[in-house]
Each structure stands twice: as structure tokens, then as C-alpha cells.
Amino acid sequence: MLNDTIVAISSPIGTGAIGVVRISGDHVKNIIDQALKRKKYTPKKMYYGWLYDKEGEKVDEITWVYHSQPHSYTGEDMLEIFCHGGKLITYAVLNTIIKYGARQALPGEFTKRAVLNGKMDLIKAEAVNNVITSETEISLKASFNQLKNAVSEKIKDIKNSLLNISAQIEVEMDYPDDIEFEDHDLKNKLVHIVNSMNQLLKEAENGIIAVEGVRTVIVGKPNSGKSTLLNALLRKDRAIVTDIPGTTRDTIEENLNINGIYIRLIDTAGIRYTEDTLERVGIERTINSIKNSHLILFVLDGTTPFTQEDELIYNKLNELGDKTVIIILNKSDSPNFTENNYLSLKQKNPNDFVIISAKNGAIKNLENKIYEKFFEKVNIEEPTLTNQRQKITLESSKEFVLNAINSLEKGFSNDIIMYDVRKALEKIYELSGENYTEELLDKIFSTFCVGK
């Protein structure tokens, strides 16, 4: 559908000084001619005038800029109209343009066209969305590093290396009697590619955390103060707080900013043995949330001894191994609070143990501990991958390169080695967007705002 013309409001909806309406496609010049009554104009120059409807009535007093293809964001003819801010007048401009033959753009469709027209690759397109949706300066920094094409250039280098190897093998296959390359030379080139991939993958998880947030799960036995802690961290009442164990039967998700670190916080059902069907479903969701988390906040009730339920959770968390766990002794405000029941646990985990009062909001030491655990991970200086799609696709490409090295070492024929090199290339093309499916693009751009 790239031959049609699209339009969308690109500014936030609501009262403001200026509204922005963006148009892209083959019909842009006709719209300028008919709706703006302008015959001569220069690209990249701002003009003042009126927008007219099809009956010749003035819709709004505007300024506008024309961008000629291919020197525009989408690579197509584009028109950007700057009208008076406000919901009614901005929608009036939008509807006027639609009556001149444009259609309402889909989410992310302008950027999707930019990718399809070769103005940017898929990695940069995802970075555009990340920059817009960044919640913290750290996530903005990681996203902006991608926006500057640094990651794309590294992927391009990997692609070119694979293309050169593919060409080298193909020449040898076409002229086996005349040309024969040394196996160790080919292996060294493949190993160099794997090393380049490893360099990107090494910081990938931290890049994902920086942009998408630290997936943080609050766990503990029922009535240990998990929901109170959630509310304290958010500085608002989000979860129901009662003295009845098992009140939280579903996961509650919220986002917050702790000293510049983006936290995706999940309050979960308390873990215990129960016959209650709904509560058991909640506990299953808790376990799934734990498996997918980066950080686990294990809440203990400081007014009670360390129970079998606490021990069950503690042992389960230890089995995970690679998770960051902070043990939180809660309810320090209570006259029944005592640290004595948990001294052994504190001695085993001296750097991961904090005492708080969630009820009174005395949680600064917990926030400092979270910052201490994750600041170095997310404060990334080097450009890196920033989502699971990018990471998984590059890992898949790397597996094919490793297969090619293995085939080479075992003395397999060139056509077998070539198969893996080509499959590795296919994954690199998928990563950059040179090889795509509509399903992939729809999934990526559906998360964009309309007008971008």
C-alpha cells in the first residue's frame, strides 16, 4: 500500500500552541495545489498561508513545509502542516486532508515506509520508538546510541564479512581445479565474525534492561507486606492492603524511576500451599513472573519468625542462581519487630539484606540498594542491542556461523559450509530489515504511536 497517501496527527492530542499534521505519499503535491492553493514552492522552506476545504472555506491559518522524495523522513513526498493547537482544530485539519484523498496512517506507518524505502534499517527504526518512549535518561542514552547508527554499522560490517566469505566459497565451488583457499584462512574469518557477534551480545541483556526496564518482582508469603511495599515505592495506593492473607490473587504491574533507573514493578500473589483455586492461579503467575524477572524483592515479616513458607520461597530463589535477589525485612515500625529471627539469613546475604518499614514509607535504603545493583549494568557507554528480537536474531545468526566452523573443522564439503553461511546472512538481513515478513513489521510497528 505504499502507493497511497497517508496522514496523521504527529503532535500530542490536547490543548497546545501548535498542532502538527503529517502527510506522506504520491498525492502530496496535489494536496498542496488544492488545499493550500500554492503552485510554486521550494523543499525544506517554511510557508505561511491558509488551509482550505473542498468547498473553498478556510479551515485554519497555518505554516507548512514540503519535503521532496527521496530527501524526506519516509523517502516519499511529505508535507508537514503546523496548525493552531487544540483537539478540535487539529482534527479539522486531519479530516480536511482525508477528504482530499489521504487515509489515516496506521501506528508507526511513517517509520515503516522509511524502512521499506531504505531510509533507515529496522534497528534504527526501533531506536526511534525507544527514544520517544524512554522513561529515564539512561534508557534515552541507550536508545540514542542506536539512533546514531553505531549498532547498525557493526551489523553492516558482519554482513559484509559474511558476504565476502560467501563469495570466496562460491568461487572455489565454481572453479575447484583453479582456485583453492586455505581452510585455516576461512576459519579465521568465521571466528572473527563470531567474536564481533559476541561483542554485541555481551552487553545485550544490559541494553535491554536499560531500555525496557528492570523487570522486578515482589515475592513473599501472604501478608508479609508486599502490596504495602508496592504502594510505598510508587508513592500512591495501587494495591489493596488488608490483614487478610491471600488478598492479592493476580499480578499488578507498574513502572517507576529509581534514581534514573527504569523499574517495571510487579506485585504478585503470596506463595503458600492453598486449596483456593483462584489463589493457586495467582501463585502460578507469580512463579512465571519470577522466571522472567531481573530483580526479585523477597519480603519477610519482621514481626514473625522465619517460617516454612519463607524457607520454601528462599530455597526456590536460590535454585534460580542467575537472578539478583534483595532480601527485605519489613515492618520495622511495629513494636513486635525483631531482627533476631533473621540474623542467620543476614549473615549469609550481608550485601543483599535491608530492613524497611513499607507502611511508613521508610524505604530509602532499599531504593539505594536497587540503584547499587543495577547502575553499572544500565549505564552503558557502548552502543548495544536493546530488545529481545535483536538479541535472539543475532544469536541465531551466530549459531549458523558456529555450524559453518564445525563443518569446516570436520572437512565437510563447501556446499554444506555455504548453507550455514547463507542462513547466517538471512538472519542478519532479518535483523536489519533487509529480509522481512509482513507479520514481523506489523508486530514491530504496532507498538509505535500514530504519526511516527
From Swiss-Prot:
SUPFAM superfamilies the record matches: P-loop containing nucleoside triphosphate hydrolases
EC number in record: 3.6.-.-
Domain of life according to the entry: Bacteria
Binding site for Mg(2+): 227, 248
Cofactor binding, per record: Binds 1 potassium ion per subunit.
Protein task: Exhibits a very high intrinsic GTPase hydrolysis rate. Involved in the addition of a carboxymethylaminomethyl (cmnm) group at the wobble position (U34) of certain tRNAs, forming tRNA-cmnm(5)s(2)U34.
Residues that, per the record, bind (6S)-5-formyl-5,6,7,8-tetrahydrofolate: 22, 80, 119, 452
A GO term from the CC aspect: cytosol
Gene Ontology MF term list: GTP binding; GTPase activity; metal ion binding
Gene3D superfamilies on file: P-loop containing nucleotide triphosphate hydrolases, Probable tRNA modification gtpase trme, domain 1, tRNA modification GTPase MnmE domain 2
UniProt-recorded name of the protein: tRNA modification GTPase MnmE
InterPro entries assigned to the protein according to its UniProt record, in alphabetical order: G_TrmE, GTP-bd, GTP-bd_TrmE_N, GTPase_MnmE, MnmE_dom2, MnmE_helical, P-loop_NTPase, Small_GTP-bd
Compartment(s): Cytoplasm
GO biological process: tRNA methylation; tRNA wobble uridine modification
Binding site for GTP: 223-228, 242-248, 267-270
Species in which this protein is naturally found: Petrotoga mobilis (strain DSM 10674 / SJ95)
Domain TrmE-type G: 213-375
Swiss-Prot/TrEMBL keywords: Cytoplasm, GTP-binding, Hydrolase, Magnesium, Metal-binding, Nucleotide-binding, Potassium, tRNA processing
HAMAP family: GTPase_MnmE
Cofactor(s) this protein requires: K(+)
Subunit structure: Homodimer. Heterotetramer of two MnmE and two MnmG subunits.
Binding residues for K(+): 223, 242, 244, 247
Family: Belongs to the TRAFAC class TrmE-Era-EngA-EngB-Septin-like GTPase superfamily. TrmE GTPase family.
